[in-house]
From Swiss-Prot:
Protein name in the entry: Cytochrome b
Binding site for heme b b562: H83, H182
Organism placement in taxonomy: Eukaryota, Metazoa, Chordata, Craniata, Vertebrata
Function: Component of the ubiquinol-cytochrome c reductase complex (complex III or cytochrome b-c1 complex) that is part of the mitochondrial respiratory chain. The b-c1 complex mediates electron transfer from ubiquinol to cytochrome c. Contributes to the generation of a proton gradient across the mitochondrial membrane that is then used for ATP synthesis.
Any one GO BP annotation for this protein: mitochondrial electron transport, ubiquinol to cytochrome c
Subcellular location: Mitochondrion inner membrane
Required cofactor(s): heme b
Coiled coil (UniProt feature): none
Subunit structure as annotated in this protein's UniProt entry: The cytochrome bc1 complex contains 11 subunits: 3 respiratory subunits (MT-CYB, CYC1 and UQCRFS1), 2 core proteins (UQCRC1 and UQCRC2) and 6 low-molecular weight proteins (UQCRH/QCR6, UQCRB/QCR7, UQCRQ/QCR8, UQCR10/QCR9, UQCR11/QCR10 and a cleavage product of UQCRFS1). This cytochrome bc1 complex then forms a dimer.
Amino acid sequence: MTNIRKSHPLFKIINDSLIDLPAPSNISSWWNFGSLLGICLAIQILTGLFLAMHYTSDTTTAFQSVTHICRDVNYGWILRYLHANGASMFFICLFLHVGRGLYYGSYMYKETWNVGVILLFAVMATAFMGYVLPWGQMSFWGATVITNLLSAIPYIGTDLVEWIWGGFSVDKATLTRFFAFHFLLPFIISALVLVHLLFLHETGSNNPTGIPSDSDMIPFHPYYTIKDMLGALVMILALLMLVLFSPDLLGDPDNYTPANPLNTPPHIKPEWYFLFAYAILRSIPNKLGGVLALVLSILILILMPLLHTSKQRSMMFRPLSQCMFWLLVADLLTLTWIGGQPVEHPFIIIGQLASILYFLIILVLMPITSIVENHLLKW
């Protein structure tokens, strides 16, 4: 008699995805972030669900309801801070996951990669709408500034913004619909994650060398289940350290002031994980140009398979490309720093140079470096 996990229609899917899945024998800890992202998503959905039971999406009571959660609901404070800092953890894992994909050439699995880019956009949209819900000063002004960017779209821009707002400014209708979408999107993300995994399991995982590993595979369980459990333990420990010791470290003090449409905060800035894109947006004096650069800064990831000019898939044996990759990482860290600074000299010019360098590295320097390395192989 065959094992039930191999014969039962439902268990068979789980078995083929998590137990008997053939995996390369040499994948490093950089391959842990997929499972960590799954755990982050589960934490966010669970904490979000319990928060939604006590939250009210009305402009008059939203801020008060968040205060009520923190003060009066049993363990409400830990739910709130797990959810807020869980988002930061989510983005740390996301950036490392994407960085791993860029470094080791995982983008050559085009379907998996493209679904991943869509997932990135969906998570960013969800995080943005979630930031609006506490209805603090930065929530309100962040929502106003970012939604207002759509008015740069020619002809339909203004109508589009007012349609999203549900009026002539960010108000009750906006908050209610943002709550509805913020609740809905994680479930759409969960469905997309399954599609992402479906495409991944069609090809199997890549590995650090970038060489096909069909001849050297091991079962996912117990080798990678135990490895993923260790990764999860480290991440959850880091998250709990953040939540229990410095829960407001990554937040903005302005968001502890209730939203006031008559008083603009001196420095409007998004959460830290959007600062790199915000810096690119601000570095272009033209509104439409800024919006296009903002969207393209993420959308450019879709072009990665087309920009791959190397004869090798991974950067493991390509020292010049490695230099370009780490230059890109340094550039993104610079942009993140600039995004949190006021718009004044010397930050303006640093932001503009870093923005130009960002697109230059991806579109020009990396492909050229790869071609040079191809020629060096012949020596």
